[in-house]
Amino acid sequence: VNLGVSMTVTTLAWTGPFRISDLLAACMDDDHAWPPASKGVYLVSRDDWRDSPSSACHPLYVGGNTGDSQRFCTRIGDLIADLHGLWDGGTGHHSGGQSLYSWCRTNKVHPGSLRIGWATRTPWCDRCAEVELVSLLATSWEERGTLLNKSRPPACRTHGRERGRP
C-alpha cells in the first residue's frame, strides 16, 4: 500500500498470540518472545488466531503507543496489571486494562486466558498501524463489534490514513 509522502506500508508482522498466563509464566525464559520496547501495536482477544487476527478471534482491545517512546512493552505491562484488577480508586495505568477487567468479570472469563499478540513492521508509523489493525477487525468504527476501545484510533496526519479506515 502506498500512502504517499514517500512511505510504502508493508504488512504487519505478528508475534503471538499467547495466552496471557503463558506469557507471564515465560517471563524468565530468554528464548520466549517478548514485546519490543517500541514500534508496536497489540491486540487482546478472547480466542486464538493464526498468522494475523480477524474478527473471528473475538477481538477485545487494540492498543499501541505513539511517537518514538520506548514504552510499548511498558504499556503492555500496564494493561496486564489493570486487566488483573491491580488498580484501585481510579489510579490505574491503563483504561483498556480496566475495561478488559470489567469484561472478564461480567463474562466470567479469567484474565489470564485471554490472548495477546503484537505486530511491527518497517517502516513504522504508529497511527497507520493502529488504523490498519482496526480496519482488519471491523468494517467501520460503528460496527466494531466486540472491541472495548472507547475511541477509535486518530487519523494519521502524516500519511493521510483516515480515522478507523484503511
Residue ranges and their predicted role:
Residues 1-60, 64-166:
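Boundary/linker segments flanking structured domains
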